[in-house]
Design a protein with these regions (language model features):
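ATP-binding/phosphotransfer module of carbohydrate and carboxylate kinases, centering on a glycine-rich
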Residues: 1-51, 97-102, 144-265
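Short glycine-rich anion-binding loops that position phosphate/pyrophosphate groups of nucleotides
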Residues: 10, 57-59, 108-111
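Conserved strand-to-helix beginnings and helix N-cap segments that scaffold or border functional pockets
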Residues: 34, 63-67, 136, 249-250
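Short beta-strand-loop/turn "lid" adjacent to the catalytic site in phosphate-handling enzymes
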Residues: 44-83, 95-96
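Glycine/charged-rich beta-loop-alpha catalytic/anionic-binding loops adjacent to active sites
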Residues: 73-77, 120-127, 255-263
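Short, acidic/small-residue loops that bind anionic groups at enzyme active sites
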Residues: 78-86, 131, 262-264
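Conserved phosphate-binding catalytic cores of ATP/NTP-utilizing and phosphoryl-transfer enzymes
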Residues: 79-104, 119
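Glycine-rich phosphate-binding loop of actin/hexokinase-like ATP-binding domains
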Residues: 99-150
Length: 265
């Protein structure tokens, strides 16, 4: 029996044989990857798994010393083999296989992984404090910041106050407005901001247009790390929950198309 754990910044997906489930345990800045995995493993069936496959956020393309992962899987599952991969690279191989191009993953965070004839490059994936512009945390944070500033009479985004009324109520109830729950609220608010943009909310559209500029630059940066040949035509694909919005991905395509001749798959 095999176990697959896909750990991201907005949650974790678990696959045990052919059964797939979700856990609301995400990689946050307060815990290491190993600490987060231990929280997840404590909630899983304590069976013996022959193979454990770990697709992990926060590795920045370098899995480093795999011994801590092996020890953890041996402790909980007595696993025979443990396979560890950066989640961005895993996404690339799953989406493009042997094609040359860029995979932009839009979840709670952001990472672009480019591949060209066996050479790989990353852009962004720097986490919520130093990067991940255009990801779920960033989009939701921008929306809530402007709405809160409007309530404080420092801004005039009244359309966002109306749009994010439920999230603002949740914000008012937070005991710690700089902790894990606050970060989770930002990520969940991104969906509301995107829906608002799709429905014509001007301030929400402004947020996504700015985000798309960042994301376009992220894709270009990733590709430039593996190719300086302007004649090459890379394949581009988008993954992650935010990529389900055609409105958002169309904005990102517009930014990419200004600087890169590519095809979308």
């Amino acid at each position: 029996m095999d176990l697959v754990v896909d750990l991201g910044q907005s949650g974790a997906r678990i696959k045990i044989d052919n059964q797939i489930s979700q856990l609301q345990i995400a990689k946050l800045t307060t815990d290491s990857v190993v600490e987060t995995l231990e929280k997840i493993f404590k909630l899983l069936p304590q069976a013996q798994y022959s193979n454990v496959f770990l697709s992990l956020t926060g590795l920045l393309g370098n899995v480093g010393d795999v011994a801590p992962y092996g020890k953890l899987c041996e402790k909980f599952f007595n696993a025979d083999q443990v396979f560890v991969m950066d989640d961005g690279l895993a996404a690339y191989l799953g989406a493009l296989g042997e094609k040359n191009g860029v995979v932009l993953t839009l979840g709670g965070g952001v990472v672009a992984v480019a591949g060209n004839n066996g050479k790989f490059g990353h852009a962004d994936g720097k986490g919520q404090i130093f990067g991940d512009f255009g990801g779920g945390f960033w989009v939701g944070q921008q929306g809530l910041r402007r709405a809160i500033s409007t309530l404080d009479q420092r801004d005039d985004a009244h359309d966002l106050v109306k749009l994010l009324s439920a999230e603002l109520e949740s914000h008012s109830k937070l005991q710690n407005k700089t902790g894990v729950d606050a970060a989770t609220l930002c990520i969940s608010a991104a969906k509301t901001v995107i829906q608002g943009a799709e429905n014509g909310v001007t301030s929400a559209q402004e947020i996504l247009k700015t985000a798309a500029k960042f994301l376009g630059a992220t894709v270009i940066a990733a590709w430039s790390k593996v190719s300086d040949n302007t004649q090459e035509k890379p394949s581009i694909t988008f993954l992650g929950g935010l990529s389900r919005s055609d409105f958002y991905t169309d904005l990102i395509r517009q930014e990419i198309n200004q600087k890169l001749n590519c095809e979308y798959v």
